[in-house]
């Protein structure tokens, strides 16, 4: 139970309000039932169930997903990176990854750094392969690998509209319906990778546990072959629109910064909040 990691006073408050989640799927399923036709019609009761569901999401699903991602792909550490549309390269094959499932983006990142594929990119006139992220996947790639962040969710169409993106690769959630139409106005290939989230008019290459790396290589090759199709007259990459950032301050990193390898602790921070030197 991840909720038991919260401070005791907070847990007591949750129990008093009766909003401690009983299980992740139970709260979601019950919310769906309550909001069905002619069921729960008391707004106060619905709000309390919404609180339980949000707790199940945050202290259940999100924390489990975070732990599993750190186990599979490594815990992030402070890393320098860059952000904004200026990270898109005018003279390289540009691939944008966008979504929420780390499996796809991690494999595309590995494939994009393959010397064999970089040579293929150079053979079509590019200086290399540039990978950038949009939305939540972008944050994961930035934290773990320093791969640039092209923008947040509302900037996905703008990234395509630079005219310099050979492929935008997506999986689930936050993918705007207009992306495919914008991509058609340029040379950009839009590629979906999840069987749960296909988009009409796009190319679909399913990525799963067995074929992830091989399919990622196929995707990178599609982007490389698309590089000569770029219309230079349509290319507009905002100059100077790029910021340097330092990211990756995880729970483990902060404890280490406060106490070193052998005395990692939040005590210095807690003490200074209590004595008033730090407002928290």
Language-model features: locations:
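Metallocofactor- and cofactor-centric catalytic cores in central/energy metabolism, strongly enriched
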Residues: 1-280
